[in-house]
């Protein structure tokens, strides 16, 4: 199943890239546990990492700080490795309200969640790829440090089918039920199976568009075929096939029975403690809730909130780390932490918030103390589990620099020859009027401006002032969700407006080549938003434009400003020297605007090729590219209904065309969510 990694790119490494690739590879081969790639904005850090992966041929996990960047990286890696398994592993919740108790108002909030089925399928596909092959790149968010089913139990539960094997039909159906597949002879969808005589059709939970047909003759498996679940057309026959569980949290029956005994023991101990402390209400509440869960587990094999008993189900001791995606990564795997100055602190903060909420639930009798072990990894556990690691950032944090020691690989020279922005410091007294004249100069030549302020009030006032003076301006604030933010950035690039005002416009990793000026108001006010790293990141937003410039408004130069200016000038000097030595003229980036939201479009086209006669690729039109994610989701549901209707009417060509369109819309939805 595994193939060697094959990098697909029209470009060869240039600038600082060849040296960075060589040094990173040497470090990994020498067994270094930690290295840092200090790559400036627009220097092709992802391309460098892709080259390292292709050269070393090692399964890799790429950690991104949020879903937006994870989607962007997923799209880029898909383009670099079209023939290999590039997978996407982020939280599958569209909406998630964890259970909680507020003692002050005696309010219990039930767990409520909405799961995105497409992302759930991609998560299952990611773990399957890690278990089956070595040419895997999994792009993950911090969701990777949260508890997942135990890989050993997951492997034990798999159903292996081979042509010629002797197995009773009822035994197959029973095993499918244990894997949490449901029988549905009417609507054939992901995670279901149907039975027609001696033929069993199974739609694997991790598959998007391929199902398995098991044909039996008496008690022998006569044939295994892969077919299109929509048209019924057989794609190929296979000698063997492995069916993976429908969820990561499946557990063998004997393990459940053993866990139930352990839960009963803990309940008895906890009841004694509560009664001894005269907590009668809490004791009654805990007994009632736990007994109900035990009955559900006995009858169905699972219960609502079964993750709270994960310690018993996976056979761990008190306080031991939960199994996570890291347990699925091979021992010689490679970890790449993108935008590490943001991602590393995030990993450190996850455990504490989760712990505080659960302690209240345990104290007031809503959960057993073992529920505290259903948690994300502690930071020291993450460190112990992480394989050889490359931290990637334009502004690495103290942790990465300390861990890497001298192994910091500089990637300052851009392949395009672009230089870091020129920096000017101007007085605060005239900052608004000065900014207005700078904006007018940029707007006249069709360039864009980013303005960052210190407070929400100032951002609002400045936006109002600029509007009164006839400027096309928008304000980006914390109430705007990720999706709308992406749309605002797209509109800025398209020229719908010229100026974007915000408080924290770092937005690591987002490409805006049209931005030629970054203005930082009150740059001399020391603090989080005006620290050295924040300033360098903000200045870097103008680094993708030939005329890139940053204006820092301040009456004095603070230590953070001095360091940021010094570092930018060091980089600029090195870039200029390289350009002069190699006769390079800086060239602006010409990146299509739809690239931001249509990351998966090419992937969908590739998937649609060569899958049976009569299939024609339905291209996602401009209408779809301009749709909001909410509208996209609505469109997807609408098309799914139409597709099923066509299939029921035996209009398979029309159904297949809609399915191809759905592929593209789902990719667009992932990119935008």
From Swiss-Prot:
It is found in: Cytoplasm. One of its GO terms (molecular function) is ATP hydrolysis activity. Keywords: ATP-binding, Cytoplasm, DNA damage, DNA excision, DNA repair, Excision nuclease, Helicase, Hydrolase, Nucleotide-binding, SOS response. It comes from the Bacteria. Pfam families: Helicase_C (PF00271), ResIII (PF04851), UVR (PF02151), UvrB (PF12344), UvrB_inter (PF17757). A motif (Beta-hairpin) lies at residues 92-115. GO terms for cellular component: cytoplasm; excinuclease repair complex. Residues 431-597 form the Helicase C-terminal domain. The UvrABC repair system catalyzes the recognition and processing of DNA lesions. A damage recognition complex composed of 2 UvrA and 2 UvrB subunits scans DNA for abnormalities. Upon binding of the UvrA(2)B(2) complex to a putative damaged site, the DNA wraps around one UvrB monomer. DNA wrap is dependent on ATP binding by UvrB and probably causes local melting of the DNA helix, facilitating insertion of UvrB beta-hairpin between the DNA strands. Then UvrB probes one DNA strand for the presence of a lesion. Forms a heterotetramer with UvrA during the search for lesions. Interacts with UvrC in an incision complex. The beta-hairpin motif is involved in DNA binding. Belongs to the UvrB family. NCBIfam families: PRK05298.1, uvrb. This is UvrABC system protein B. The gene is uvrB.
């Amino acid at each position: 199943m595994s193939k060697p990694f094959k990098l697909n790119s029209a470009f060869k490494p240039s600038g600082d890239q060849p040296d960075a690739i060589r040094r990173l590879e040497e470090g990994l081969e020498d067994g270094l546990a930690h290295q840092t790639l200090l790559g400036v904005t627009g220097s092709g850090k992802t391309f460098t990492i892709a080259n390292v992966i292709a050269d070393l041929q090692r399964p890799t996990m790429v950690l991104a700080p949020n879903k937006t960047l994870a989607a962007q990286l997923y799209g880029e890696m898909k383009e670099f490795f079209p023939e290999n398994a590039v997978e996407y592993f982020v939280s599958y919740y569209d909406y998630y309200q964890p259970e909680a108790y507020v003692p002050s108002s005696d309010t219990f909030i039930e767990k409520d969640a909405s799961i995105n089925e497409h992302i759930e399928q991609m998560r299952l596909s990611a773990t399957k790829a890690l278990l089956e092959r070595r040419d895997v790149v999994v792009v993950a968010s911090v969701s990777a440090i949260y508890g997942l089913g135990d890989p050993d139990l997951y492997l034990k539960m798999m159903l292996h089918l081979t042509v010629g094997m002797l197995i009773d039909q009822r035994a197959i159906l029973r095993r499918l039920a244990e894997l949490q597949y449901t029988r549905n002879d009417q609507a054939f969808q992901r995670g279901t199976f149907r039975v027609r005589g001696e033929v069993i059709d199974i739609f694997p939970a991790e598959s998007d568009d391929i199902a398995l047909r098991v044909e039996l003759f008496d008690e022998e498996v006569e044939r295994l075929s892969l077919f299109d679940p929509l048209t019924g057309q057989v794609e190929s026959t296979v000698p063997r096939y492995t069916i993976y569980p429908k969820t990561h949290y499946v557990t063998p029956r004997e393990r459940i029975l053993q866990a139930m005994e352990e839960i009963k023991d803990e309940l008895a101990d906890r009841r004694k403690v509560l009664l001894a402390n005269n907590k009668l209400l809490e004791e009654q509440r805990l007994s009632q809730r736990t007994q109900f869960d035990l009955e559900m587990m006995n009858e169905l094999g699972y219960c609502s909130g079964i993750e709270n008993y994960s310690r018993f189900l996976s056979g761990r001791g008190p306080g031991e780390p939960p199994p996570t995606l890291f347990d699925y990564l091979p021992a010689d795997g490679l970890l790449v932490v993108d935008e590490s100055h943001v991602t590393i602190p995030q990993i450190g903060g996850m455990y504490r918030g989760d712990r505080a909420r659960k302690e209240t639930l345990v104290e007031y009798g809503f959960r057993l103390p073992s529920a505290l072990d259903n948690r994300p990894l502690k930071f020291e556990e993450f460190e112990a589990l992480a394989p050889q690691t490359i931290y990637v950032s334009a502004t690495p944090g103290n942790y990465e620099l300390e861990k890497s020691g001298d192994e910091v690989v500089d990637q300052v020279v851009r392949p395009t020859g672009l230089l870091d922005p020129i920096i000017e410091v101007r007085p605060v007294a005239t900052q608004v009027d000065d900014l207005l004249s700078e904006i007018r100069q940029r707007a006249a030549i069709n360039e864009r401006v980013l303005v960052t302020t210190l407070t929400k009030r100032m951002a609002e006032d400045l936006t109002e002032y600029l509007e009164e003076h006839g400027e096309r301006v928008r304000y980006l604030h914390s109430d705007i969700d990720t999706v709308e933010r992406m749309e605002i950035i797209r509109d800025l690039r398209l020229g719908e407006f010229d100026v974007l005002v915000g408080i924290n416009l770092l937005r690591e990793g987002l490409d805006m080549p049209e931005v030629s000026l970054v203005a930082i108001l009150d740059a001399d006010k020391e603090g989080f938003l005006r620290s050295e790293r924040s300033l360098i990141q903000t200045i870097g937003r103008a680094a993708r434009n030939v005329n890139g410039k940053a204006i820092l408004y301040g009456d004095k130069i603070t230590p953070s400003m001095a360091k940021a200016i010094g570092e930018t000038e060091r980089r600029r000097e090195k870039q200029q020297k390289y350009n002069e030595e190699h006769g390079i003229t800086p060239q602006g980036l010409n990146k299509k605007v739809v690239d931001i939201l249509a990351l998966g479009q090419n992937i969908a086209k590739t998937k649609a090729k060569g899958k049976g006669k009569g299939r024609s690729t339905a291209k996602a039109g401009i209408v779809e590219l301009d749709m909001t994610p909410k509208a996209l989701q609505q469109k997807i549901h609408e098309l799914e209904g139409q597709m099923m209707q066509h299939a029921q009417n035996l209009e398979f060509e029309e159904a297949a065309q809609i399915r191809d369109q759905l592929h593209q819309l789902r990719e667009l939805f992932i990119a935008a969510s």
